């Protein structure tokens, strides 16, 4: 079963002389458990595609479905909830909240959903990412690699159907 399907996805910015086509007719199918890497030159549309696949932005044309849900049909609030529950996003810049501890940053998606964490799974995630001893640290007390691992843990903590990582 396809967990992700892209059909003819296009993204255009601007109009007239300022029109820029970032994506043109992208077709992609990804099965559950499959690993796919999108590579290309700087400015080739990789991050734009990631934002569309992650329900952060909408395509100008075409269709994207995740687990059978057509992302274009989601209103802003629905998209935010869908993204939080179904799509793990790890950005090139970690987007950690500087005033929250590592633990609270990791648990943020569950907190927003008013869900209790599965403590055993939480321990498994932080241990596997080497963060067990840093849970009370603030992001500015971590190395860049540790901050990236916190962002990965935050994306994994709610067991998303799809994990997307930008660089």
What are these regions (language model features)?
Residues 2-167:
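ABC family nucleotide-binding domain
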